[in-house]
Amino acid sequence: MSFRINTNIAALTSHAVGVQNNRDLSSSLEKLSSGLRINKAADDSSGMAIADSLRSQSANLGQAIRNANDAIGMVQTADKAMDEQIKILDTIKTKAVQAAQDGQTLESRRALQSDIQRLLEELDNIANTTSFNGQQMLSGSFSNKEFQIGAYSNTTVKASIGSTSSDKIGHVRMETSSFSGEGMLASAAAQNLTEVGLNFKQVNGVNDYKIETVRISTSAGTGIGALSEIINRFSNTLGVRASYNVMATGGTPVQSGTVRELTINGVEIGTVNDVHKNDADGRLTNAINSVKDRTGVEASLDIQGRINLHSIDGRAISVHAASASGQVFGGGNFAGISGTQHAVIGRLTLTRTDARDIIVSGVNFSHVGFHSAQGVAEYTVNLRAVRGIFDANVASAAGANANGAQAETNSQGIGAGVTSLKGAMIVMDMADSARTQLDKIRSDMGSVQMELVTTINNISVTQVNVKAAESQIRDVDFAEESANFSKYNILAQSGSFAMAQANAVQQNVLRLLQ
């Protein structure tokens, strides 16, 4: 057994152990007071790196959720604005429907047109002023916008909102068969009285659709009226609607004279004696209308005193009379009625409520005036056009001109908006087209909103899981750490006692000196 005074190994050992115990005790107290297992890199360097990455991811996910909520707010702002625009369009169509009946006077139609123009101003005002955080939403500039919805770059959702101003919506494409070819004027050889089958090309951008053939003749259930009926029966598939106007009009007012051997659509009317100029006493129109239930043709006089023969159901109109009788009718469509095969087919109008071209081919389609070489009347309008005049081009493409005489009457157009019957019909189509366009935009935005909501739900769950993972690494387990604290506290106290005893052991050396 050896005794040393200069170096107290036991005391040094007790001191070293005591320092470590105090360090552990301090660390345990720090963890208990902060609630964190990792307070500094030395506590768990690799764990801290992982926990910091998870904390960053959680914070970024939280911002992504806020971004998605901002995007939802923008989409909802635009959606509510367009909802108001659709209500305006519904009102415009209601007023157009109100104007589309000849019980209205020109003044009452002008009043309706004035209301519609005010409504269009408000529709454009909504399109130009709806904004979110200074960004215009409905002017067309909100295109291909991206929203970061993830913790890492390029995790985005894209959204675009087209323009909803009146000059960008409400497109209507109108095409009406030629009124200089066989589809309109009399055909002396009657080669246009035949079977016609139309083929609508690239209806949905890809497919062609062929409809059943229709006989063009003067019999009931035939003619472009029957053709129009078939087209409308499948309008949802073909993407177009059809209307027709079969009318023969004199080139000048009715002249005085006698009409001999008058036959219309195979029904013999006979001789009409002493017809007065302008058919002043109505004997010519009365004679024709007395058999209209058999001919399907109704006669009337226009404001200029010209006779109009109108096909009630869209069958062709065949008129025959003895030589020189055509002069009494005033020429025009009746210039050749002394021939044996004189017929008027009429004009077929196709309308599509968007801006795409209408492409037609088929069997004998030129016989109803739809060959491009025949000069098909075609025009595309948008909702803004309601503010102006529907000019002669619009009138012809919309089918307002049944023949050359009517085209001359409408050479300056058909007036503004709903101030005419045909104009009111066009405005109705425009309102439908505009509403469809807005509904498509709203549908797209609804899909974006649903995507954002789903994203928020997913990110929220992910954020919770990331937070849980971070907590598992960073946060302290109080039960475990309390046990550690008790251990370190006892060790610290016992260490102090041991150090005191180690120092006291050196006193034993004095006994050797006594």
Curated annotation (Swiss-Prot):
GO terms for molecular function: structural molecule activity. It is found in: Secreted; Bacterial flagellum. SUPFAM superfamilies: Phase 1 flagellin (SSF64518). Keywords: Bacterial flagellum, Secreted, Virulence. InterPro entries: Flagellin, Flagellin_C, Flagellin_C_sub2, Flagellin_hook_IN_motif, Flagellin_N. GO terms for cellular component: bacterial-type flagellum; extracellular region. It comes from the Bacteria. Gene3D superfamilies: 3.30.70.2120, f41 fragment of flagellin, N-terminal domain, Flagellar export chaperone, C-terminal domain. Disulfide bonds: none annotated. Transmembrane segments: none annotated. Heteromer of FlaA and FlaB. FlaB is located proximal to the hook while the remainder of the filament is composed of the predominant FlaA. Flagellin is the subunit protein which polymerizes to form the filaments of bacterial flagella. Important for motility and virulence. PANTHER family: FLAGELLIN (PTHR42792:SF2). Belongs to the bacterial flagellin family. This is Flagellin B. It comes from Helicobacter pylori (strain J99 / ATCC 700824). The gene is flaB.
